[in-house]
Amino acid sequence: MTTSDLPAFWTVIPAAGVGSRMRADRPKQYLDLAGRTVIERTLDCFLEHPMLRGLVVCLAEDDPYWPGLDCAASRHVQRAAGGAERAGSVLNGLLRLLELGAQADDWVLVHDAARPNLTRGDLDRLLEELAEDPVGGLLAVPARDTLKRSDRDGRVSETIDRSVVWLAYTPQMFRLGALHRALADALVAGVAITDEASAMEWAGYAPKLVEGRADNLKITTPEDLLRLQRSFPH
């Protein structure tokens, strides 16, 4: 499938979190990664894609860092209010897309602000494999290590069959209308939503797993940032 044959898409980047585990003086999406902020590098892969229709970044109301970035002035990038949790931020982002003219059956990709190493190859693979899918899905990586389940005392209770276990990554790609309904209903029901796929699962769907690269890391600890520094030229 050529690039022009890939489906057009919108993107939502939830970026209202603080990232307290980084022990930094600012949210992790604004930390330096080889001369640019993490979030700028995260946005690059989407803004450089010819099938992108538009991108919404969900930000804390008092965010002092975003306005100073070059990407904040891009005509392809819009801002939405961040929520108290990820699900609320994404829901606000979807509503902003509807205001921008997105339709219920349009594809939306939700991606972590602190996951800056997404490759064009992985993005295109996700778009291609899900282009005709009735549900949508997500980038994921098969578990490679032996997995153990613990009891309440921190002792092994069983070994889990890793052949059926995947690590959920982003982007996660769904139809705007279906994802909006799933998130809104889950929030009303008080369901704990950790990612968009979990909302779709709760709504009765079975998202497709699309294998991606393991180095599409989400920055969670200072060690993650140091590891990714080696992936970007200075």
Swiss-Prot record:
Keywords: Isoprene biosynthesis, Nucleotidyltransferase, Transferase. Pathway: Isoprenoid biosynthesis; isopentenyl diphosphate biosynthesis via DXP pathway; isopentenyl diphosphate from 1-deoxy-D-xylulose 5-phosphate: step 2/6. It is an enzyme of class 2 (transferase). The record marks R162, K218 as: Positions MEP for the nucleophilic attack. It comes from the Bacteria. The record marks R21, K28 as: Transition state stabilizer. GO terms for molecular function: 2-C-methyl-D-erythritol 4-phosphate cytidylyltransferase activity. Coiled coil: none annotated. Its EC number is 2.7.7.60. GO terms for biological process: isopentenyl diphosphate biosynthetic process, methylerythritol 4-phosphate pathway. Catalyzes the formation of 4-diphosphocytidyl-2-C-methyl-D-erythritol from CTP and 2-C-methyl-D-erythritol 4-phosphate (MEP). NCBIfam families: ispD (TIGR00453). Belongs to the IspD/TarI cytidylyltransferase family. IspD subfamily. This is 2-C-methyl-D-erythritol 4-phosphate cytidylyltransferase. It comes from Pseudomonas aeruginosa (strain ATCC 15692 / DSM 22644 / CIP 104116 / JCM 14847 / LMG 12228 / 1C / PRS 101 / PAO1). The gene is ispD.
